Amino acid sequence: MLKGENIKGYKILEDFKVAGGMSKISFAEKDGKTYFIKEFLAPKYPTSDSPGSERIKEQKRKACDEFEKHHRDLNNAIGKCCAGTGGNLIYAIDFFRDGTSYYKITEKIDISSFPCESISCLPLEKILLIAKSAVHSIRILHGLKIVHGDLKPDNLPIKEAARGYVVKLIDFDDSYFEGNPPPDRENLVGTPEYYSPEQAAYIMDEDEEIEGATLTCKSDIFTLGIIFSEYFSGEKPILPPDYKNTWTCVNNGGAISFKKKLHPQIDGLIRKMLSLNPNDRPNINEVFNVLKNIKLDEITPSSERMSSDEPKKPSLRFGPGFKPISSKGVSPATKTIAPTPEEISKEKDTEYKPVHSGLRGSGLKIADK
């Protein structure tokens, strides 16, 4: 698709560019308004003149129908909650197939993304505003029992407003309803350096022994813990030399640390978010309550190492055969919209108490540390 061409009433303003290997992106105009447009590189809908036997083409059509239903169901759920454009969630306002390709349309947003290194240099109260705004956006999604699946700073663009900061949430290509990820694991790409242990195990399980029920909103919480490390310290968690990703380190009981000394409540929160067992992680409402109740006058002595720095040997590793023994500990958010300032001021404080469970797994041996 090239500049000047028209598709379903959208005039393409720029040649499409490959983005992330799974899609091409551009901008388009319709009825005098500019939109963001994405073309999916897969799946491709087989037409009557497409190569291959009719049996193979029918299989591909079925896969495309499932892909289309998945995206429409997500878009409808988010759209009903957000009621139009201009909100915190930048979701697809149009989704269609043209020929063999699928396209997604979202509103165009003009937001400059802050590098995490710059965010970490802000006063703590400003970093907290950014973190709470990010949580507000994510809790809308979790209130619908939808897992984002690809949280990262690029998908949480920040806008500086007159009264603070607004963090949007974009790119729901890897999103799914809690416990029901797409069966085609190859299309659940995400961003490996932000994987949770259970997300990595599910995607990398070639024998497909790990059930989708293991993937809940708590997977996003692990990823958000990595992002919070970037917000508050300027970098992802510091890992031992043998590990490349946070999830491999946590999965093998490795110790993590941070680039700089963190406020004790923030340090403790991030460590809980990075728990191996999803049941030991706070839900998104509990994360918000901790951030809301941070006491800025508390100072961590630089010469004192936090007791929580000592790693605990994990009681499980995610691997083939892993099944949650219950749904306890997976506490869905109770709100589906971001709270107003009045609601925030009235919200009852919630003391976070992690739930310890007897989860066990047989261990997925992953070469890439």
Regions found by a protein language model. Name each.
Residues G99-S112:
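Conserved short submotifs of the Hanks-type protein kinase catalytic core
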Residues I130-A131:
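Activation segment signature within eukaryotic-like protein kinase domains
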Residues L274-E286:
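A conserved short helix/loop substructure at the end of the activation segment
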Residues H142-K159:
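Catalytic-loop of the protein kinase fold
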Residues L89-Y102:
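Short beta-strand micro-motifs within the conserved protein kinase catalytic domain, predominantly
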Residues D220:
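Conserved catalytic-loop aspartate of Hanks-type protein kinases
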Residues K24, E29-D73:
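ATP-binding glycine-rich loop module of kinase domains
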